[in-house]
Protein backbone atom coordinates (compact mmCIF):
# COMPACT_ATOMS: atom_id res chain seq x y z
CA UNK A 1 0.00 0.00 0.00
CA UNK A 2 2.83 2.41 0.72
CA UNK A 3 4.34 1.65 -2.62
CA UNK A 4 0.97 2.32 -4.32
CA UNK A 5 0.61 5.65 -2.55
CA UNK A 6 4.12 6.65 -3.52
CA UNK A 7 3.47 5.81 -7.13
CA UNK A 8 0.10 7.54 -6.93
CA UNK A 9 1.70 10.77 -5.67
CA UNK A 10 4.27 10.61 -8.37
CA UNK A 11 1.63 10.20 -11.03
CA UNK A 12 -0.34 13.13 -9.61
CA UNK A 13 2.69 15.47 -9.85
CA UNK A 14 3.39 14.37 -13.37
CA UNK A 15 -0.24 14.97 -14.34
CA UNK A 16 -0.14 18.47 -12.84
CA UNK A 17 3.08 19.32 -14.67
CA UNK A 18 1.68 18.00 -17.93
CA UNK A 19 -1.49 20.05 -17.45
CA UNK A 20 0.52 23.20 -16.86
CA UNK A 21 2.63 22.55 -19.93
CA UNK A 22 -0.50 21.97 -22.02
CA UNK A 23 -2.06 25.20 -20.72
CA UNK A 24 1.12 27.17 -21.49
CA UNK A 25 1.27 25.64 -24.94
CA UNK A 26 -2.35 26.58 -25.56
CA UNK A 27 -1.73 30.18 -24.42
CA UNK A 28 1.41 30.38 -26.54
CA UNK A 29 -0.48 29.01 -29.50
CA UNK A 30 -3.27 31.53 -28.96
CA UNK A 31 -0.78 34.44 -28.83
CA UNK A 32 1.00 33.22 -31.92
CA UNK A 33 -2.34 32.87 -33.67
CA UNK A 34 -3.25 36.47 -32.77
CA UNK A 35 0.11 37.72 -34.08
CA UNK A 36 -0.37 35.78 -37.31
CA UNK A 37 -3.87 37.20 -37.72
CA UNK A 38 -2.54 40.73 -37.18
CA UNK A 39 0.12 40.14 -39.80
CA UNK A 40 -2.36 38.69 -42.27
CA UNK A 41 -5.01 41.40 -41.67
CA UNK A 42 -3.23 44.62 -40.66
CA UNK A 43 -6.31 46.71 -41.48
CA UNK A 44 -8.47 44.74 -39.08
CA UNK A 45 -5.78 45.01 -36.43
CA UNK A 46 -5.51 48.74 -36.99
CA UNK A 47 -9.29 49.13 -36.87
CA UNK A 48 -9.37 47.19 -33.62
CA UNK A 49 -6.63 49.44 -32.22
CA UNK A 50 -8.52 52.55 -33.33
CA UNK A 51 -11.70 51.28 -31.73
CA UNK A 52 -9.89 50.95 -28.41
CA UNK A 53 -8.81 54.64 -28.44
CA UNK A 54 -10.78 57.12 -26.36
CA UNK A 55 -12.71 59.97 -28.08
CA UNK A 56 -10.25 62.48 -26.59
CA UNK A 57 -7.26 60.72 -28.14
CA UNK A 58 -9.01 60.44 -31.51
CA UNK A 59 -9.89 64.12 -31.38
CA UNK A 60 -6.29 65.09 -30.66
CA UNK A 61 -5.00 62.94 -33.51
CA UNK A 62 -7.51 64.41 -35.96
CA UNK A 63 -6.58 67.90 -34.79
CA UNK A 64 -2.89 67.14 -35.39
CA UNK A 65 -3.61 65.89 -38.92
CA UNK A 66 -5.67 68.98 -39.75
CA UNK A 67 -3.00 71.32 -38.35
CA UNK A 68 -0.33 69.64 -40.47
CA UNK A 69 -2.51 70.07 -43.57
CA UNK A 70 -3.10 73.72 -42.67
CA UNK A 71 0.61 74.44 -42.29
CA UNK A 72 1.39 72.76 -45.61
CA UNK A 73 -1.32 74.76 -47.40
CA UNK A 74 -0.15 78.00 -45.77
CA UNK A 75 3.43 77.33 -46.89
CA UNK A 76 2.30 76.48 -50.43
CA UNK A 77 0.21 79.66 -50.63
CA UNK A 78 3.09 81.79 -49.36
CA UNK A 79 5.40 80.29 -51.99
CA UNK A 80 2.74 80.91 -54.66
CA UNK A 81 2.49 84.58 -53.69
CA UNK A 82 6.25 84.98 -53.84
CA UNK A 83 6.46 83.30 -57.26
CA UNK A 84 3.60 85.45 -58.58
CA UNK A 85 5.22 88.66 -57.29
CA UNK A 86 8.55 87.72 -58.88
CA UNK A 87 6.86 86.88 -62.18
CA UNK A 88 4.93 90.17 -62.21
CA UNK A 89 8.11 92.13 -61.53
CA UNK A 90 9.94 90.30 -64.31
CA UNK A 91 7.07 90.99 -66.73
CA UNK A 92 7.03 94.68 -65.75
CA UNK A 93 10.76 94.99 -66.37
CA UNK A 94 10.47 93.20 -69.71
CA UNK A 95 7.69 95.54 -70.90
CA UNK A 96 9.56 98.63 -69.70
CA UNK A 97 12.70 97.43 -71.44
CA UNK A 98 10.86 97.03 -74.75
CA UNK A 99 9.22 100.47 -74.44
CA UNK A 100 12.54 102.15 -73.77
CA UNK A 101 14.21 100.36 -76.67
CA UNK A 102 11.47 101.63 -78.98
CA UNK A 103 11.98 105.21 -77.85
CA UNK A 104 15.76 104.90 -78.08
CA UNK A 105 15.27 104.55 -81.84
CA UNK A 106 13.41 107.88 -81.87
CA UNK A 107 16.20 109.46 -79.82
CA UNK A 108 18.76 108.29 -82.39
CA UNK A 109 16.73 109.90 -85.16
CA UNK A 110 16.45 113.13 -83.17
CA UNK A 111 20.24 113.27 -82.86
CA UNK A 112 20.65 112.76 -86.60
CA UNK A 113 18.01 115.40 -87.34
CA UNK A 114 19.76 117.95 -85.14
CA UNK A 115 23.08 117.38 -86.89
CA UNK A 116 21.42 117.78 -90.26
CA UNK A 117 19.55 120.93 -89.15
CA UNK A 118 22.82 122.67 -88.27
CA UNK A 119 24.05 122.45 -91.83
CA UNK A 120 20.72 122.48 -93.71
CA UNK A 121 20.07 125.40 -96.04
CA UNK A 122 16.49 124.46 -96.86
CA UNK A 123 14.02 124.99 -94.01
CA UNK A 124 11.46 122.72 -95.66
CA UNK A 125 13.76 119.73 -95.22
CA UNK A 126 14.00 120.48 -91.49
CA UNK A 127 10.22 120.70 -91.21
CA UNK A 128 9.87 117.44 -93.11
CA UNK A 129 12.32 115.74 -90.76
CA UNK A 130 10.43 116.96 -87.68
CA UNK A 131 7.13 115.72 -89.12
CA UNK A 132 8.67 112.33 -89.77
CA UNK A 133 9.96 112.15 -86.19
CA UNK A 134 6.52 113.11 -84.87
CA UNK A 135 4.89 110.31 -86.86
CA UNK A 136 7.47 107.80 -85.66
CA UNK A 137 7.02 108.90 -82.05
CA UNK A 138 3.24 108.60 -82.13
CA UNK A 139 3.34 105.25 -83.92
CA UNK A 140 5.17 103.89 -80.87
CA UNK A 141 2.49 105.32 -78.59
CA UNK A 142 -0.20 103.69 -80.74
CA UNK A 143 1.68 100.41 -80.54
CA UNK A 144 1.06 100.39 -76.79
CA UNK A 145 -2.64 101.29 -77.07
CA UNK A 146 -2.60 105.09 -76.98
CA UNK A 147 -4.99 106.98 -79.25
CA UNK A 148 -5.95 110.60 -79.79
CA UNK A 149 -9.44 111.67 -78.79
CA UNK A 150 -11.48 112.94 -81.71
CA UNK A 151 -11.87 116.70 -81.23
CA UNK A 152 -12.51 118.19 -84.65
CA UNK A 153 -14.11 121.62 -84.96
CA UNK A 154 -17.93 121.48 -85.03
CA UNK A 155 -17.90 117.91 -83.68
CA UNK A 156 -20.23 117.25 -80.77
CA UNK A 157 -18.96 117.99 -77.28
CA UNK A 158 -18.69 114.83 -75.17
CA UNK A 159 -18.27 115.51 -71.42
CA UNK A 160 -16.75 112.03 -70.99
CA UNK A 161 -13.96 112.77 -73.48
CA UNK A 162 -13.73 116.57 -73.55
CA UNK A 163 -13.22 119.27 -70.93
CA UNK A 164 -14.83 122.64 -71.67
CA UNK A 165 -12.32 125.40 -70.96
CA UNK A 166 -14.45 128.20 -72.47
CA UNK A 167 -17.98 128.68 -73.75
CA UNK A 168 -18.19 130.92 -76.81
CA UNK A 169 -21.34 132.51 -78.18
CA UNK A 170 -21.33 131.93 -81.92
CA UNK A 171 -23.60 130.95 -84.75
CA UNK A 172 -20.81 129.64 -86.96
CA UNK A 173 -21.12 126.12 -85.58
CA UNK A 174 -24.06 124.22 -84.02
CA UNK A 175 -24.79 124.66 -80.33
CA UNK A 176 -22.80 122.48 -77.90
CA UNK A 177 -20.14 121.66 -80.49
CA UNK A 178 -16.38 122.20 -80.37
CA UNK A 179 -15.10 125.58 -81.52
CA UNK A 180 -11.39 125.13 -80.85
CA UNK A 181 -8.98 122.61 -79.30
CA UNK A 182 -6.43 123.89 -76.80
CA UNK A 183 -4.89 120.57 -75.84
CA UNK A 184 -5.21 117.16 -77.45
CA UNK A 185 -6.81 114.44 -75.36
CA UNK A 186 -5.68 110.81 -75.18
CA UNK A 187 -7.19 107.43 -74.37
CA UNK A 188 -5.29 104.27 -73.49
CA UNK A 189 -7.00 101.07 -74.63
CA UNK A 190 -10.27 103.04 -74.91
CA UNK A 191 -9.94 104.49 -71.38
CA UNK A 192 -9.63 108.28 -71.26
CA UNK A 193 -6.40 109.21 -69.48
CA UNK A 194 -6.51 112.89 -70.43
CA UNK A 195 -9.61 114.66 -71.79
CA UNK A 196 -9.20 117.12 -74.64
CA UNK A 197 -9.24 120.79 -73.56
CA UNK A 198 -11.73 122.57 -75.83
CA UNK A 199 -13.95 125.63 -76.20
CA UNK A 200 -17.65 124.93 -76.72
CA UNK A 201 -20.18 126.86 -78.82
CA UNK A 202 -23.27 128.47 -77.37
CA UNK A 203 -25.65 129.76 -80.01
CA UNK A 204 -27.21 133.11 -79.03
CA UNK A 205 -30.71 131.84 -79.72
CA UNK A 206 -30.14 128.78 -77.55
CA UNK A 207 -28.58 130.89 -74.79
CA UNK A 208 -31.69 133.10 -74.60
CA UNK A 209 -33.84 130.02 -74.12
Curated annotation (Swiss-Prot):
It is found in: Cytoplasm. GO terms for molecular function: adenyl-nucleotide exchange factor activity; protein homodimerization activity; protein-folding chaperone binding; unfolded protein binding. It holds the Pfam family GrpE. The keyword DNA repair does not apply. GO terms for biological process: protein folding. Homodimer. This is Protein GrpE. It comes from Methanosarcina barkeri (strain Fusaro / DSM 804).
Amino acid sequence: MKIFNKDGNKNSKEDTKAGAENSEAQNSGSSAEEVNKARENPEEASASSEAEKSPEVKCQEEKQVLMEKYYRLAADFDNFKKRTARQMEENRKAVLEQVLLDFVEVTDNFDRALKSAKTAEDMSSIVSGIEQLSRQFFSILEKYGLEKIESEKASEFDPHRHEAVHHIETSEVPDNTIVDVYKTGYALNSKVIRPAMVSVARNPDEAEK
